[in-house]
């Protein structure tokens, strides 16, 4: 398998795996705009040269859009291999490339968000355990922070206090999200429209800076839905799934 690094120089012409469309599509344009601002912060986007979902995205943890204390580590935003790409060892290829790059850059190790049982849009815990990752922290909602240290003496990553007990003081449905995932550009407006049409209390909070993300009241900032203050899910929804959730 041939792999390509997406950079500022080739961002315009390369597809971004999870949203394969032209650059005018709102999902593609929002993701590419977010990526363009991250490259100078050290973000790496490595993908299959073939079209499809086969890529890894990672960034120095100090610049990660999640509320963690993991100075010196590399944070994996997303590792996604699916469809016809599964079962060929490509996840291992991508992870190994990340490990090699992180070692060369003097990082202490890797860290990533996981759940004890596989959840949508989170990495497979069985795969990570097989690769040597272990749990280093866990929030009340079951979202875990896993790590693979290159140095046994290195401090372990941990969640910031604001993320350990996900809760907000607001009634109704409240969604925190970023532009890291391209699907949000399409489906967040769908939820806003659906909620309005069905008189469902709903507010979407677009996290637009690293500082906002690192102080968010949830370990997952990419997509975190709350109801009456309590965390509900990180699974992105269309109108039908949302209405089913609220029993409408």
Where are these regions (language model features)?
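Conserved acetyl-CoA-binding loop-helix of GNAT-fold acetyltransferases
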Residues: 81, 87-102
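Conserved beta-strand in the GNAT
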Residues: 51-63, 75, 80
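Conserved catalytic-core motifs of GNAT/GCN5-like acyltransferases
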Residues: 113, 132-147, 232-235
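C-terminal "cap" of GNAT-fold acetyltransferases
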Residues: 141-165
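Conserved GNAT acetyl-CoA-binding A-motif
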Residues: 102-120
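A conserved beta-turn-beta hairpin within the catalytic core of GNAT-like acetyltransferases
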Residues: 64-76, 86
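Non-catalytic, surface beta->alpha helical segment in thiol-disulfide oxidoreductase systems
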Residues: 228-248
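Short amphipathic alpha-helix that is part of the acyltransferase structural core
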Residues: 1-51, 161-163, 171, 182-183, ...
